[in-house]
Design a protein with these regions (language model features):
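Hydrophobic alpha-helical segments
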Residues: 1-201
Length: 201
């Protein structure tokens, strides 16, 4: 179960957000736009950033989900532990490495960011807009990770179920379509838990 008794049936970030859809729907529209935004890193690179930040935060749910999306795009799952070990020697595009160093530092030690971190990205050919998009992906997944871990949903993660539902391929096609399909198929309750009283403990 999660840390929230009335949320016991919720096993994913999607369902958590849909339980308060009046609050979270605009945010999910934003995430859909962000991950499909033409400027900045490619869709694959954004998914790599999402998975990498989630692994750094030890969020098994978000890491597993976005690692599988990356794998559906052709990324080797062994990339991510190699990125954690050493970005410089990891088998990833050289241009992306300063961005990955940037989001790693932003995730783990945000108070230590400097202008040199940004300049490393500019020297590699990234624009200010590109870096803003990368920062936004990093920041969004740090938020997702804390939502999952804070609610205790991470303990219910089942990677096989995620793959068997074809979720990685559906998310590649667009986050909004993925959420719309979940609602249409009854996989999420948008009315949400309504227990306003403190749980009995």
């Amino acid at each position: 179960m999660t840390y929230f008794p009335s949320y016991d049936g919720i096993i994913s970030m999607s369902q958590l957000q849909m339980s308060k859809w009046d609050l979270f729907e605009p945010y999910m529209e934003f995430i859909h736009r962000l991950m499909n935004y033409e400027a900045g890193p490619t869709q694959e690179e954004k998914e790599i950033i999402a998975a990498f930040c989630s692994l750094l935060n030890a969020c098994d749910f978000c890491y597993g989900a976005h690692k599988n999306v990356c794998m559906a795009m052709g990324v080797d799952e062994e990339l991510f532990p190699k990125l954690v070990d050493d970005i410089d020697t990891a088998p990833v595009d050289e241009k992306l490495k300063p961005v990955l160093r940037y989001v790693r530092k932003l995730t783990l030690t945000p108070d230590r960011m400097t202008d040199e971190d940004a300049k490393d990205c500019y020297r590699a050919g990234w624009s200010e807009e590109d870096l803003t998009i990368a920062i936004t992906v990093c920041s969004s997944w740090n938020w997702f990770n804390r939502m999952i871990l804070g609610h205790g949903i991470d303990r219910k993660w089942d990677e096989a179920v995620f793959r068997d539902r074809g979720a990685p391929e559906k998310m590649m096609a667009g986050y909004k379509a993925y959420y719309d399909e979940m609602i249409a198929n009854g996989l999420a309750d948008t009315s949400g838990p309504k227990n306003m009283a403190p749980p009995q403990v």
